[in-house]
From Swiss-Prot:
Single Gene Ontology BP annotation: DNA-templated transcription
Catalytic activity: RNA(n) + a ribonucleoside 5'-triphosphate = RNA(n+1) + diphosphate
InterPro entries: DNA-dir_RpoC2_beta_pp, DNA-dir_RpoC_beta_prime, DNA-dir_RpoC_beta_prime_bact, RNA_pol_asu, RNA_pol_N, RNA_pol_Rpb1_1, RNA_pol_Rpb1_3, RNA_pol_Rpb1_3_sf
Residues the entry annotates as binding Zn(2+) 1: 60, 62, 75, 78
One Pfam family here: RNA_pol_Rpb1_3
Cofactor or coenzyme needed: Mg(2+); Zn(2+)
Gene (name only): rpoC
Name used for this protein in its record: DNA-directed RNA polymerase subunit beta'
Xref: SMART domains: RPOLA_N (SM00663)
Domain of life, source organism: Bacteria
Gene Ontology cellular component list: DNA-directed RNA polymerase complex
Molecular function GO labels: DNA binding; DNA-directed RNA polymerase activity; magnesium ion binding; zinc ion binding
Record lineage: Bacteria, Bacillati, Bacillota, Clostridia, Eubacteriales
Species of the source: Pelotomaculum thermopropionicum (strain DSM 13744 / JCM 10971 / SI)
Enzyme Commission numbers on file: 2.7.7.6
Length: 1170
């Protein structure tokens, strides 16, 4: 018995007419759908019950047999088999065509597969198929040539001249005959021979033909199967017809298209039986061909067939394509049961691992569990009465619900889910009201706020799902951000402000200078109003002796675990982040979530006690503002005078004025910071990192400064006022440009960023950690990344958590600082940097040799846990999310520096896209192709650079007008160095510097864009993407292999093929590496299911069908599409046989695979957190 749910590969191919007949349950002969009086399907029509099965369970069409007991009986009156009605989703019918027609995908695609096989141009093919010209199928011994086209008149002349000595016909029949005659083996041999003899265009054509011939030869498809004699009719449930209120019917477009085919087919049959004249029959055949084309792919050829309201009908191809198609709408994104959504509000009293679930929502979501419990506990006798109890909401139902949800985690998701922290698991707590409550510290991960955001709840049902939710997805286990390994669950806003207020010191307050024997006494004194929170006091701390601190800091340190020491400083957001990080590294998840809850409680308490509010008088304008502005105005006047006298150019004037005003703005800002009191609420908010920053305070109390106009050019008239004083009309108008641009930018950016993420996910979705060590001896050498003189990424950041390729030795003492094959820890990295080492060789994803993924050693540390990555981790998806999620923070705009030509380099999101798509960059730099010495000279007003290599060969580069040189006369340059300013074309770099050169360039460029915008992403995520872009090679000379010249093939497959040929003693193939953009790389993946669900669905499927492609189901998408567990994480085959055993008694603990106990949350959070 074929098990439909358990298969490990899937193949696609062309169906032969016999195959289609074998699948079919009967022939559809009439175009009728349902009888308008009885509303029952017509016999032999498109919804016929005899072909497709009964419309009602266990009931035949005429009603002779009703009930399950007649299961499998075929009614003798109406011929309907008595069975379940859901077979109407599974059974196919067919239409026997009176004349063969071609399949539009294979005739019309680019390149036309039929045309290549027959060596005909698509135009000639179209003329034959659509009955314009005759084609000679057998010239006999006449002067005609095989496959020659004849017009109507030419055909008549030839008939008169040669009689029946030759055969010529038109339509798909003629093409079918020609396709049947093709001998693939022989054709392949001829083409291979031809390849050796011809060059140029003819060679390219021969390669293309050979590709198609080889595809047919290897897959076992026959060319004549591209011509259809039988058309399958898909199941009626997949093209339903439903009655609307008002007696009208709504139907799927496919039914209309099928009806046209059947009508025309029946008419053609009748004409053939009557022996109608040739011209009428031909017209009918052409119409049949067009009807079938419209059914398969409407609009591909000619004008699409339209329905009411001039709307093109959706054909079979359209059912698969696009966001609303079968792939993306139903297979990759399904709606799920046991889910709900509601508005979110803050739940400050929750623990980190909890969420508040509205009672009525919880009851509905956990209904089946509650019903089962009611029966088990004896409240109800059977499920039916239990259901009634739940629906009537009896009081005992609530008690049972409380028990059911205990220790049963639920998943919360907020759209858009940009990274994996957008779905986390929580333990539900029942709350009154109708809003979901969430813990304030998970807002950062969800990017949620409480201005009306909504969230969705999902219930994991099986024991396995619950265990995974608890161990992998619980919010207290997701404290670190996978993109950079820094804590993401950190205090924000009020909490930060409260802690800052608590730990800040103030002079001249009650109790200053007092001494206490222990911390408890000091806190007691504060509660008895004997000493202020901010007073500097002396306290004897256990194990630390006497220290000077404040009461607030003592209170703060009560929630800090002993192991982290005593924090005697003002605590702002940065410090808090570091405390959380240290706590996690030293003490693990449970201690960190306790700490976070402690900080949350303290923060909110003291933010409330502080009573920090903002009034208009808190915005103090610096007294020096007037004189600073006066000074600046005088300087500007001087510059204007010089310009009027013609001493400086407009450009210089503009630059100077901008410079003057920027300095003035900075001076006002400095003056402002000096005037602000340290306890000024506005200052406290900005300084603690709770909300706002100095730039915003500057606009409130300093001056707004310079603004940009709509093109991005800075207007040289500053806004001198601030918001407290109020803007003049002109100032207000000038500032609207920037505001509008900001909003437009954000809207565009969101969509672009989402699309980039989708492409990234698609290209990397099958990168999974598959083995411990791939055994490669290669790696990359990393240094710090610089932009000019500014360090963008420190060496330390680049090596922490990576595996050293070779021992790192101290340059002076020779001491080994890090061993080869071991992970470099934070402390080792610090030692390496301290020893003055500038370059370190590490293992990298870029050089990993694992076939379908990466290995542990090349990947290194999993940033989300801070430990070594596990086998089965879907690192490709994590990488795509880490790069895509901050995409919305990148700017869209191209910066214009005062309209200077040649300075416009793309930055922000468009630059990231340009790099990942491997496009030719805007403002391309010229690069040296070999090492040598530079000579710059001017020829006829054009500059050119000549590079003389060591061996005396010279290469000359023309410098385009307006380009800036990066080299001077006599400079020494190396291959791949930039000679002019701008961005390098990565494809050129690949030719000159090879794979490693382009890898490092792309990595550094992507990092540069993100770091300049203040976004930290770990190198390894970008490396995963770059590796996917360089997976393929292009075959140059095939040698004795079966490869085709110019074909793209996976590096590993290429090496396998060469190994095979070498072992047989043959000539191996040669190839060059190619760099594919992420879109191309996704479409070039081995899995046709993954490629088809991404873009260009019809093209991918056409090609896959001809090649008879096999999908090994290695990636995640393919498995989601066919409804299997994904082969990553716990879905990997090595983890499949582990089962979760339910606990027999609530008191007993069950061991969990992996050695951790399945802990109850009450142990983690004892009374201390409350």
């Amino acid at each position: 018995m074929l098990d439909l749910n358990n298969f490990d590969r899937i193949r696609i191919g062309l169906a032969s007419p016999d195959q289609i007949r074998a699948w079919s349950s009967g022939e559809v002969k009439k175009p009728e759908t349902i009888n308008y009086r009885t509303l029952k399907p017509e016999r032999d029509g498109l919804f016929c019950e005899r072909i497709f099965g009964p419309t009602r369970d266990w009931e035949c069409h005429c009603g002779k047999y009703k009930r399950v007991r007649y299961k499998g009986v075929v009614c003798d009156r109406c011929g309907v088999e008595v069975t379940r009605s859901k077979v109407r989703r599974e059974r196919l019918g067919h239409i026997e065509l009176a004349a063969p027609v071609s399949h539009i995908w294979y005739f019309k695609g680019i390149p036309s597969r039929m045309g290549l096989l027959l060596d005909m141009s698509p135009r000639a093919l179209e003329k034959v198929l659509y009955f314009v010209s005759y084609i000679v199928t057998d010239p006999g011994d006449t002067g005609l040539i095989k496959k020659q086209l004849l017009t109507e008149t030419e055909y008549r002349d030839c008939r008169e001249r040669y009689g029946n000595a030759f055969k010529a016909s038109m339509g798909a029949e003629a093409i079918k005959k020609l396709l049947e005659e093709i001998n693939l083996e022989e054709l392949a041999r001829e083409l291979r021979q031809e390849l050796k003899e011809v060059t140029g265009q003819r060679k390219i054509r021969a390669i293309r033909r050979l590709e198609v011939v080889e595809a047919f030869r290897k897959s076992g498809n026959r060319p004549e199967w591209m011509i259809l004699e039988v058309i399958p009719v898909i199941s009626p449930e997949l093209r339903p017809m439903v009655q609307l209120d008002g007696g009208r019917f709504a139907t799927s477009d496919l039914n209309d298209l099928y009806r046209r085919v059947i009508n025309r087919n029946n008419r053609l049959k009748r004409l053939l039986d009557l022996g109608a004249p040739d011209i009428i029959v031909r017209n009918e055949k052409r119409m049949l061909q067009e009807a079938v084309d419209a059914l398969i792919d409407n609009g591909r050829r000619g004008r699409p067939v339209t329905g009411p309201g001039n709307r093109p009908l959706k054909s079979l191809s359209d059912m698969l394509k696009g966001k609303q198609g079968r792939f993306r709408q139903n297979l990759l994104g399904k709606r799920v049961d046991y889910s709900g959504r509601s508005v979110i509000v803050v739940g400050p009293e929750l623990h980190l691992h909890q969420c508040g679930l509205p009672k009525e929502m919880a009851l509905e979501l956990f209904k089946p569990f509650v019903m089962k419990r009611l029966v088990n506990d004896g409240y109800a006798h059977n499920i039916k009465s239990a259901k009634r109890m739940v629906e009537r909401v009896r009081p005992e139902v609530w008690e049972v619900l409380e028990e059911v949800i205990k220790e049963h985690p639920v998943l919360l998701n907020r759209a858009p889910t940009l990274h994996r922290l957008g779905i986390q698991a929580f333990e539900p707590v029942l709350v009154e009201g109708r809003a979901i409550q969430i813990h304030p510290m998970v807002c950062t991960a969800y990017n949620a706020d409480f201005d009306g955001d909504q969230m969705a709840v999902h219930v994991p049902l099986s024991a396995e799902a619950q265990a995974e939710a608890r161990l992998l997805m619980l919010s207290s286990n997701n404290i670190l951000n996978p993109k950079d390994g820094r804590p993401v669950a950190i205090p924000t806003q009020d909490m930060v402000l409260g802690i800052y207020y608590l730990t800040v010191e103030k002079q001249g307050v009650p109790g200053e200078g007092k001494a206490f024997k222990d911390p408890e006494e000091a806190v007691m004194a504060y509660y008895n109003n004997a000493v202020s929170l901010h007073a500097a006091v002396k306290v004897r701390m256990p194990g630390m002796g006497r220290i000077e601190t404040t009461v607030g800091r003592i209170i703060f340190n009560e929630v800090i675990p002993r192991e982290l020491g005593y924090y005697n400083q003002v605590i702002d957001k940065k410090v808090l982040s570091k405390i959380v990080d240290d706590c996690y590294r030293k003490l693990g998840f449970s201690a960190t979530s306790k700490l976070l809850d402690g900080i949350k409680k303290l923060g909110f308490t003291f933010a409330t006690r502080a009573g920090v509010t903002i009034g208009i008088q808190d915005i103090t304008i610096p007294a020096r503002k007037k004189e600073i502005l006066k000074e600046a105005e005088q300087q500007v006047e001087k510059v204007e005078q010089q310009y009027r006298r013609g001493l400086i150019t407009e450009e210089e004037r503009y630059r100077k004025v901008i410079g003057i005003w920027n300095d003035a703005t900075k001076e006002v800002t400095d003056a402002l910071i000096e005037t602000l009191d340290k306890f000024n609420p506005v200052y406290m908010m900005a300084n603690s990192g709770a909300r706002g920053n100095i730039q915003q305070i500057r606009q409130l109390a300093g001056m707004r400064g310079l603004m940009a106009d709509p093109s991005g050019r800075i207007i040289d008239l500053p806004i001198k006022a601030n918001f407290r004083e109020g803007l003049t009309v002109l100032e207000y108008f000038i500032s609207t440009h920037g505001a509008r641009k900001g909003l437009a930018d954000t809207a565009l950016r969101t969509a672009d960023s989402g699309y980039l993420t989708r492409r990234l996910v698609d290209v990397a979705q099958d990168v999974i950690v598959r083995e411990v060590d791939c055994g490669t001896g290669q790696g990359i050498e990393v240094t710090e990344i610089k932009d000019g003189n500014e360090v963008i990424e420190k060496l330390e950041d680049r090596i922490i958590g990576r595996v050293a390729l070779e021992d790192v030795k101290h340059p002076e003492t020779g001491e080994i600082l890090a061993f080869a094959g071991e992970e470099i820890t934070e402390s080792e990295a610090a030692k390496i940097v301290a020893a003055g080492i500038k370059k370190v060789k590490i293992r990298s994803v870029l050089t990993c040799r694992t076939r379908y993924g990466v290995c542990i050693k090349c990947y290194g540390r999993n940033l989300a846990t801070g430990r070594q990555v596990d086998i089965g981790e879907a690192v490709g998806i994590i990488a795509a999310q880490s790069i895509g999620e901050p995409g919305t923070q990148l700017t869209m705009r191209t910066f214009h520096t005062g309209g200077v030509a040649g300075d416009d380099i793309t930055q922000g999101l468009p630059r990231v896209e340009e790099l990942f798509e491997a496009r030719r960059p805007k403002g391309q730099a010229i690069i040296a192709e070999a090492d040598g010495t530079v000579e710059v000279r001017e020829v006829k007003g054009r500059r050119e650079i000549e590079v003389t290599a060591e061996d005396g060969t010279k290469s000359v580069y023309q410098v385009p007008y307006g380009a800036r040189l990066k080299v001077r006369d006599g400079d020494r340059v190396y291959a791949g160095d930039e000679l002019t300013e701008g961005s390098v074309n990565p494809h050129d770099l690949l030719k000159i510097k090879g794979v490693q050169g382009v890898q490092i360039y792309l990595l550094q460029e992507v990092q540069r864009v993100y770091r300049l915008q203040g976004v930290d992403i770990n190198d390894k995520h970008i490396e995963v993407m770059i590796r996917q872009m360089l997976r393929k090679v292009k075959v140059d000379e095939p040698g004795d292999t079966d490869l085709l010249p110019g074909g793209l093939i996976d590096i590993f497959e290429f090496e396998d093929e060469n190994r095979r040929i070498k072992n047989l003693g043959g000539e191996p193939a040669t190839a060059k590496p190619v760099l594919l953009g992420i879109t191309k790389a996704s479409l070039a993946t081995d899995s046709f299911l993954s490629a088809a669900s991404f873009q260009e669905t019809t093209r991918v499927l056409t090609e896959a069908a001809i090649k008879g492609k096999l999908d090994l189901l290695l990636g995640l998408k393919e498995n989601v599409i066919i409804g299997k567990l994904v082969p990553a994480g716990t879905g990997m085959s090595r983890y499949r046989n582990i089962s979760v055993v339910a606990e027999s008694e609530p008191g007993e603990e069950n061991g969990e695979p992996g050695g951790e106990r399945l802990y109850g949350m009450d142990e983690l959070y004892g009374e201390t957190a409350n």
